[in-house]
């Protein structure tokens, strides 16, 4: 017995047996595949199993898998199908990924994230949205400025009208005051509003003809009885109703 070559011959025989067995199994598998899928002489081709219509365009493994196989559906993702369909139809604008994915390094991104990052950027979308908000605010500011300008025009018109009315009233009062002063110098009778020429409102009280207005007792002792000067107005002794009556009578006169 050859002990020196026993190990080599045993290992070589095992390798040959294994190679022959694998080759035989491979030939049987190829023969089975030819009989089931690639034999044009059989009339039962495709009667038992329904294959995809695009099997010529697909890979050999997909070509051998029937449509009703559930394992193939589990492996493929519906998002991948949607992406392929959108890319095939030319609609490459996909919704943006979550904002947290932009903080990741580029090596960890998948192809889908890269496509999304190229086609639609949330930064660009936010920029457009903020620009729209700024434009709306500018339009609103212009609208408010227009309202303020219109209100200012109305206020200016009212101010000019009030100024004209004040000047008209002051002119009419000054004319009446001159006439009243001329009549007071001759008849010492009161008519119209008292002016500074007749009753001056100064520090220390009322003044009448540049003299302080005193009480009725002082006036009586100096100027005589009250009946002699019935047309004079004694504001300190008269009541409010009497003053109003005197003023109304002076207006009518």
Swiss-Prot record:
Its main location: nucleus. It holds the Pfam family Spc29. InterPro entries: Spc29 (IPR031392). Keywords: Cytoplasm, Cytoskeleton, Nucleus, Phosphoprotein. It comes from the Eukaryota. Residues 69-91, 211-231 have a biased composition (Basic and acidic residues). MPS1-mediated phosphorylation at Thr-240 is required for spindle pole body duplication. One of its GO terms (biological process) is spindle pole body duplication. The modification Phosphoserine is found at residue 65. One of its GO terms (cellular component) is central plaque of spindle pole body. Belongs to the SPC29 family. This is Spindle pole component 29. It comes from Saccharomyces cerevisiae (strain Zymaflore VL3).
